[in-house]
Design a protein with these regions (language model features):
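Structural alpha/beta core scaffold segments of enzyme domains
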Residues: 1-238
C-alpha cells in the first residue's frame, strides 16, 4: 500500500500508450536500462508463456491470456493508456526519467470511441482471437458462435410477452441513454508493494478486498504456485 516503506525498496513507473489502437512494432529499452539507478525494465516479453484458460478472478471469470495482455500490452495497444513497459528504479524520479528513454515504434490502427461503433460489423477488431459467446440468461458458459467481433458475450434474457405488454401499456417511451465511465472514487491513494524473497516466496501488499483473486491471478500470469504467494490487504478508504 501507499503507507508501506521497506528498506531498499524500488519504485515503479509505467509507460503507457498514447494511442487508442496501435500495433507495437518494436520496443527498445536499452537506454532506459543503462540509466544509473534503474534496476529493471519489463515488457510483455518478460512474462512466461501461459496456457490460456478461464479462471475465477474474484468478482468475475476471465481469460488468463487477456488479463496478462491487459497488464502489459503484447502485440497491440488496445486503448489509450494501455501499459507498454514498466521501470523499477531506486527512486521515483529516476524511474520517470527512464520512461522518457524507452523508444516504442507504433503502427497506428483505426479505432472507435463508443460501444455502438465497436459493435458494428465493420468495426476494427481489438482482440483478433475473440469470438462472441451466446447464452440464454446470464448463467453458464454459453455457446461459441465462432464470430470474430468486439462483442465478448451476447446474453438473451426473456421475461413475459413484451409485445403484449406494449399493447396493454397506456404509454410507451423509448429512449437510449449513455453516460461517461463512472468510478466509485475511493479516497485512499492506491498502491501495491511486493517482495520476492530468495526462497521463491512472493509477498504482496495492496489495497484490495479480493485477496484470493489477487493471489490466483498472480499465480496464473506469473506461472508460480499459489502456495508461494501471500497477499496482505492494506487499509481501504472509501
Amino acid at each position: 500500500g501507499a503507507d508501506l516503506v521497506m528498506a531498499g525498496q524500488l519504485h515503479g513507473r509505467i509507460l503507457r500508450s498514447p494511442h487508442a489502437h496501435a500495433r507495437i512494432l518494436s520496443i527498445d529499452t536499452s537506454k532506459a536500462e543503462a540509466l544509473e539507478g534503474v534496476m529493471a525494465v519489463a515488457t510483455a516479453k518478460d512474462f512466461p508463456v501461459i496456457q490460456d484458460r478461464i479462471l475465477d478472478f474474484a468478482e468475475s471469470q476471465s481469460s488468463v491470456r487477456m488479463q496478462a495482455e491487459n497488464l502489459l500490452a503484447h502485440d497491440k495497444a488496445l486503448y489509450q493508456g494501455h501499459a507498454i513497459a514498466a521501470v523499477a528504479a531506486i527512486n521515483p524520479h529516476i524511474a520517470e526519467e527512464a520512461l522518457k528513454l524507452i523508444d516504442v515504434e507504433f503502427e497506428v490502427l483505426p479505432s472507435v470511441i463508443t460501444a455502438d461503433e465497436a459493435m458494428k460489423e465493420d468495426a476494427p477488431i481489438l482482440h483478433d482471437s475473440l469470438t462472441t459467446m451466446f447464452k440464454v440468461d446470464r448463467f453458464g458458459a454459453g455457446d461459441n458462435t465462432g464470430v470474430n467481433s468486439n462483442i465478448a458475450s451476447h446474453v438473451q434474457i426473456t421475461r413475459g410477452d413484451i409485445q403484449q405488454g406494449f399493447k396493454e401499456a397506456d404509454l410507451v417511451i423509448e429512449r437510449s441513454f449513455t453516460t461517461q465511465t463512472v468510478h466509485q472514487g475511493y479516497i485512499e491513494p492506491f498502491a501495491c508493494s511486493a517482495q520476492w524473497s530468495t526462497d521463491g516466496h512472493l509477498t504482496i501488499w495492496c489495497s484490495t478486498q479480493a485477496i484470493f483473486g489477487i493471489r490466483g491471478a498472480t499465480s496464473a500470469i506469473l506461472n508460480i504456485a499459489e502456495s508461494d504467494i501471500k497477499v496482505i490487504p492494506m487499509e481501504i478508504g472509501g
